[in-house]
Amino acid sequence: MITPPDAGGYSDNQLTRALYVRDMTSGGHTLFDIHAALNWPSVTLPGGWACREEDMLQLLSQSSDEDIHRELRMMNIDYCGDDYVNCYLRPLNLWLRTDVSEGAAQRLERFHTAVVGQWERLAQAARRRSTIPLFLEAVSVTDETEIWMEAIRLNGQGFRVEVAAEASGVPAVANHRFEHHLMWCGDGITPSMKAIFQSSLEAGDPVMLTGTDTRVKLPENTLSASA
């Protein structure tokens, strides 16, 4: 799609073309879509993430587990890690968890199993490479799949991720050495866990809060007692 640079480097036209390909890929278009758009600019392309999601929903309804695993594997190869997780896996997870149609529970279970299975294969491959060790601790989650999607995203950024998936309300202990420690908050953080985070931070530990909701939240039993 992009010709190699000459001795003087890439031309302006080549750089423009490369940026266009990147933008199309970030929009969830396939290589076939991008090739068509480059060669026939007047063609209106269907596709994008919505079509990729529809393809997976069809597989979850009708196809074998191997077909589902193969599709996830190819999607992870064809798209960058952040786009794959943020624009594809997370919207699919949300859709499946709000779906009330017939067979919804089975589709969600198959999706969760496929995501965890993909993570296990990626983690095994990462152990064979020279990658940066990172400890991902679930402080709180809104569902059982989100911590594994985040682990896949971090793997795509070049980390070798150890996951503590159970949000138990007490600090998790890593089994391996790590250079970074991320505390994932999908549904807030309790005052006690926030205090532990602050103490670790003040001690100079390589720790950071991350996730979709890092607000301090009181435990529900405390709220009930004060109501």
Predicted regions mapped to residue ranges:
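Basic, Lys/Arg-rich alpha-helical nucleic-acid-recognition elements, primarily the DNA-binding modules
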Residues: 1-45
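Short secondary-structure capping/turn micro-motifs that flank functional sites
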Residues: 40-41, 92, 170-171
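Charge-rich, acidic-biased intrinsically disordered regions
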Residues: 44-46, 137-138
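Generic helix N-cap/helix-start motif at coil->alpha-helix transitions
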Residues: 48-50
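Mid-protein regulatory/catalytic core that forms ligand/cofactor-binding pockets
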Residues: 54-159, 163-166
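C-terminal regulatory/effector modules of DNA-binding transcriptional regulators
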Residues: 116-227
